Amino acid sequence: MEEVYKVVEGFYNQFEWEDIAKDLTPYKGIVFCGMGGSGIIGSFASKWLEHRSFNKPTFVVKDYTLPPFVDRDYLVFCISYSGNTEETLSNFEEAIGRGIKPLCITSNGKLMERAKEEGCEIYEVPKGFQPRYSLGFMLSKVLNLLGVDKDELEDAKENLKENLESLKQKGKEIANRIYGYIPVVYSTPLTAHIAERWKGQINENSKSPAYFTILPEMHHNEVMGWSNPELRNKFVYLLMFDEKDHHRVKLRVDITKKILEDFGVVPIMLKGEGNSYLARSLYLVHLADWVSVFLAELYGYDPVPVKTIERIKEELKKHA
């Protein structure tokens, strides 16, 4: 566990500003392709662009195929830490077939090999990590390519560094509250990508089921599941929000909290700290890292191995 803690502690050091910004003006929109620990990069970047009022569409592809309208007028990112993610490789080949040269974020593998063969731009990240422990390296590359301000990125990095000890402590406290229950993260539109990360980190590191859903949509269906106390009490509920959420969404967060409390459930409230949306988002992302590794320790699991995921990959290879 000590080695895992060391990697998690170094998260803030994965962020570095680089002068590599692309001119986004010529493009109709941006497409981010990736799966799992690499796929969350696209979700994060898309939401960050939306918050900056980027006036072109962004699409996150977590599948084998690109949307049919994507052509050479779109900027396409192919993100795979290992370079061997079959869905992302499929996206890459489809893009090449349409005359698109994707920007490739990877550490190695077939994606790097094919990108070199096709003359695509490659943005290499350090080898030797699990994809989920290299989010900062990959996200830093993508944000720099999208033109993040140097001050914004450096402030977010400093925010992580300054809050490291408090994040560890909060992570341990939340892990103790989650232990023995199935976590459900209720997020807002501005925090949905972070809730997705929480789910993935708890799944992979803690070897636990976990789920997330989004306000206000969940107010139109999921809330009725609370009516069944026998099932309701098997879960622990986390309410995630951002200070810049729509005022009606904030009201819905308050209403959700009150109704859960009326059912005798005390939700865990999750709000990022920081001077910018990026800083607050990364704060919550890093909190998930700590929660998930402490929860793994409580359950007696090594956070690193992902045997079932590896088994699926091996089964798929039999049908290549």
From Swiss-Prot:
It holds the Pfam family bact-PGI_C. It comes from the Bacteria. Keywords: Carbohydrate metabolism, Isomerase. It catalyses: alpha-D-glucose 6-phosphate = beta-D-fructose 6-phosphate; D-mannose 6-phosphate = D-fructose 6-phosphate. Its EC number is 5.3.1.8, 5.3.1.9. D-fructose 6-phosphate binds at residues 37-38, 80, 82, 85, 132, 220, 313. The keyword Isomerase applies. The keyword Isomerase applies. InterPro entries: Glu6P/Mann6P_isomerase_C, SIS_dom, SIS_dom_sf, SIS_PGI/PMI_1. One of its GO terms (biological process) is carbohydrate metabolic process. The active site is at 204 (proton acceptor), 220 (proton donor), 313 (proton acceptor). PROSITE patterns: SIS. One of its GO terms (molecular function) is mannose-6-phosphate isomerase activity. Residues 20-153 form the SIS domain. CDD domains: SIS_PGI_PMI_1, SIS_PGI_PMI_2. Homodimer. Belongs to the PGI/PMI family. Dual specificity isomerase that catalyzes the isomerization of both glucose-6-phosphate and mannose-6-phosphate to fructose-6-phosphate. This is Bifunctional phosphoglucose/phosphomannose isomerase. The lineage of its organism: Bacteria, Pseudomonadati, Aquificota, Aquificia, Aquificales.
